[in-house]
Amino acid sequence: MSKETSLPLTYKEKAIVFRGGGLGDFILTLPLLAHIRNSYHEVIFLTKPSYFSLVNKREGILELLDLDLGLSQILKRIEGADIFTFWDDVEWKNELQDLGANQVFILPTRPIAGPHIVEAMFEKMNTPFLPSIFTDAWIGDDWIKNSNMWIHPGSGGDYKNMPFSFYKNLAETWLKKKNSNWVTFCFGEADHKICKNFKEANFIFSARIKSVHPISVEEYKNNLMQGVCEFWGNDSGPGHLAANLGIPTNICFRSTKSSIWRPTGPRVNIHEFDEDSI
């Protein structure tokens, strides 16, 4: 979606943005993309096709291209363009400049210190940053409230994920509160171990628990938009998706820094854990 993200700059002609990475990385780039769309007449955005459904193409001039098809599809369009890329490679930067790029902005990918990653992106561009960026729903504030607690217990890797017992306890506590409450456990393609934990768990009120395995980002988004009371998960892409749909989102940070990686969104709650408390 197109929002006011900073003080207006002089309107420029063309920008080309390259963005790969995981789902969370992509969603954290949406504020920057909105700023670029507000600053350029033409924007070409190369990313994974699986992310296309998260970008509002109706507002402003934006062309979405498949990142995996490479530079060859835009060779003749680089001249005079400002380039925004997350690949910090000298040869890559030189190639873009040789093709006539105006400016090449190398944006941060994995900072371990400093400001929030979104703010760090704006700093790299020497662009004023508005704190309200943190509380916007960058995919759309589409929360529909019902009695379904959505839990995504995996997708963060062993060093990020909370123990499955933590989420089992959350689910059972929620189910005890009201007979109308129910729980959806959601699993990604790499969550085999945690899915096994789920199948082996001896839940109370198991009739009010279901599991889903979305096969695409778009399917996951559509499932969440059908209604939930709140989302619980680890520092991973699904949490960023829920938060930027306006859903009340609880993210458990175990080994990464919430000051750098917390999701943007209007209803985000952060829960910090250290190894001694788990």
Question: Over which residues does each language-model region extend?
Answer:
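Catalytic machinery of carbohydrate-active enzymes
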Residues: 1-278
